[in-house]
């Protein structure tokens, strides 16, 4: 289903972006690797988040997902060596403390007896994927508008999903649309 979700998004965008993308095909060809990486991070994050819901609760996934801005800021600091402002450190700390407080329901015993499952870890990988997408946005070349760039990223993002879609279709059967 994820594969078709992204293919549908690509198809819907075509009439609005085709001329701009066609006029900038040389730019897209020269920078295909960053578009593929961005597509993989964007589509991967969404796919992992939805996959996690097969194993964990929506509440757990939502709580862990609230750390997204903090993780993005931390990765920007670690990978890109960007300096963070004091207010960002405060924001990161408060996000982490807030999530821990909510998960624990203000009860230390809950944290001590916390049982994580595979779905919780998949959410973490989804967050990491989204964060990598966010911090690599600055690597995108100038020249395409917002929607043409989104189109190209989504277009390239469907390719990493294709083997999984084919495998699922062979092993489980085609995805019902209705």
Regions found by a protein language model. Give the residues of each.
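Juxtamembrane helix-start motifs in multi-pass secondary transporters
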Residues: 1, 87, 146-150
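Specific alpha-helical transmembrane segments that line the substrate/conduction pathway
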Residues: 1-11, 42, 50-83
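Juxtamembrane helix-entry segments on the extracytoplasmic side of multipass membrane proteins
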Residues: 2-3, 26-32, 104-129, 166-178
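Hydrophobic residues within membrane-embedded alpha-helical segments of Major Facilitator Superfamily
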Residues: 8, 41-42, 48, 64, ...
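Hydrophobic transmembrane alpha-helices of multi-pass small-molecule transport proteins
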Residues: 13, 36, 75, 84-106, ...
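Transmembrane alpha-helical segments that form core, pore/gating elements
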Residues: 13, 72-74, 78, 111-169
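Specific transmembrane alpha-helical segments of multi-pass solute transporters/efflux pumps
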Residues: 18-65, 101, 178
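Loop-to-transmembrane alpha-helix entry segments
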Residues: 29, 65, 81-101, 116-117, ...
